[in-house]
Amino acid sequence: MKMVGRAWKFGDDISTDHITPGRYYHLRSNMPELAKHVMEDADPDFMKKFRPGDFIVAGKNFGMGSSREHAPLALKIAGVSAVIAKSFARIFYRNAINVGLPVLIADTDSIDSGDELEVDLGKGLVVNRTKGIEIRVKPIPEVMLKILHEGGLVSYVKKHGDIKI
């Protein structure tokens, strides 16, 4: 699975409240509306700059805070191709895989906002086309790659009946 888009960079400790601000929680049953507000508390102009297919890039502990699955789902519905970070909160990481949002662990120091990236999930590689460098990502376990390729856990189970680990 290859994806190309621009990077939008954030720092460490981006919480689920930064991703989906609590004041919009009443929209949780209307995910397309909630998705219009992703990252608003981290960057009020994010959705004005972002285009579907772009990537979110961050430092350590992305997705910390509450365990609500609305955060990764809203990112996916907004059109985020993948989140690339130095590390993720464990619950966010699993929720992202379960909703079909690729999450990649990599050194993000050489990526800046606006850089054009090419991500190859199968090869575990991020190419920063703007800077002409390759960044290896921590391999995604095979079962998780299969879930991502099906669009999430529910789609995977509907198609295959169960998960063989």
UniProtKB/Swiss-Prot annotation:
SUPFAM superfamilies registered for this protein in UniProt: LeuD/IlvD-like
Keyword annotations of the record: Amino-acid biosynthesis, Branched-chain amino acid biosynthesis, Leucine biosynthesis, Lyase
InterPro entries: Aconitase/3IPM_dehydase_swvl (IPR015928), AconitaseA/IPMdHydase_ssu_swvl (IPR000573), IPMI_Swivel (IPR033940), LeuD (IPR050075), LeuD_type2/HacB/DmdB (IPR011827)
Pfam family membership, one: Aconitase_C
Molecular function GO labels: 3-isopropylmalate dehydratase activity
EC numbers, comma separated: 4.2.1.33
Reaction(s) catalysed (UniProt annotation): (2R,3S)-3-isopropylmalate = (2S)-2-isopropylmalate
GO terms for biological process, alphabetical: L-leucine biosynthetic process
Lineage top rank: taxon: Archaea
Pathway of action: Amino-acid biosynthesis; L-leucine biosynthesis; L-leucine from 3-methyl-2-oxobutanoate: step 2/4
Main function: Catalyzes the isomerization between 2-isopropylmalate and 3-isopropylmalate, via the formation of 2-isopropylmaleate.
HAMAP family registered for this protein in UniProt: LeuD_type2 (MF_01032)
Family named by the database record: Belongs to the LeuD family. LeuD type 2 subfamily.
Subunit structure: Heterodimer of LeuC and LeuD.
Official protein name in the record: 3-isopropylmalate dehydratase small subunit 2
